[in-house]
Amino acid sequence: MSDSKVNMVSPPEGLTGEGFFATKLNDVVGLARANSLWPLPFATSCCGIEFMATMAAHYDLARFGSERVSFSPRQADMLLVMGTISKKMAPILRQVYEQMSEPRWVIAVGACASSGGVFDTYSVLQGIDKVIPVDVYVPGCPPRPEQIVDGVMRLQELVKSESVRRRSSPEYQELLASYNIS
């Protein structure tokens, strides 16, 4: 995962012993967030079946901190969009995203969510990044559970390295404004 070294320091005044280390609050918050992501599956086709396998005992996504699958956007911070999204479904997906509290992350699982897949028609959204910002793309049609786990692990690395203040930065606000999200 991370190759950061632990900075061992001498104990604070008045204390004796070994094993004291110094870190930044940013690192602690990043580690806590990365290992406690609550997924919200938004599945419309076969990628959802692969996600079910990912949550089952053999692959067990809970080992990576995603113990509690939420079916309420208000209680989730990781949106997994799986499958074909029609243009009529796009406003609903966007509404689900907007109902999630900050910080929130999005994983586009499979070819359909990433680029429309084989459905290059007038009624299919050609990638969910047309309506919401995406943090990680998982390729495949459908992707194997191992690939979904890898996508979650990549998101964890992104979350760990993200500054506590990034979500309130002008750059992030500009990104949301480009999607007309306040």
Curated annotation (Swiss-Prot):
The keyword Membrane applies. Keywords: 4Fe-4S, Cell inner membrane, Cell membrane, Iron, Iron-sulfur, Membrane, Metal-binding, NAD, Quinone, Translocase, Transport. Its EC number is 7.1.1.-. Belongs to the complex I 20 kDa subunit family. Its cofactor is [4Fe-4S] cluster. GO terms for cellular component: plasma membrane; respiratory chain complex I. This is NADH-quinone oxidoreductase subunit B. GO terms for molecular function: 4 iron, 4 sulfur cluster binding; iron ion binding; NADH dehydrogenase (ubiquinone) activity; NADH:ubiquinone reductase (non-electrogenic) activity; quinone binding. It comes from the Bacteria. It is a peripheral membrane protein. PANTHER family: NADH DEHYDROGENASE (PTHR11995), NADH DEHYDROGENASE [UBIQUINONE] IRON-SULFUR PROTEIN 7, MITOCHONDRIAL (PTHR11995:SF14). [4Fe-4S] cluster binds at C46, C47, C112, C141. It is an enzyme of class 7 (translocase). It catalyses: a quinone + NADH + 5 H(+)(in) = a quinol + NAD(+) + 4 H(+)(out). GO terms for biological process: aerobic respiration; electron transport coupled proton transport. NCBIfam families: nuoB_fam, PRK06411.1, PRK14820.1. NDH-1 is composed of 14 different subunits. Subunits NuoB, C, D, E, F, and G constitute the peripheral sector of the complex. It is found in: Cell inner membrane.
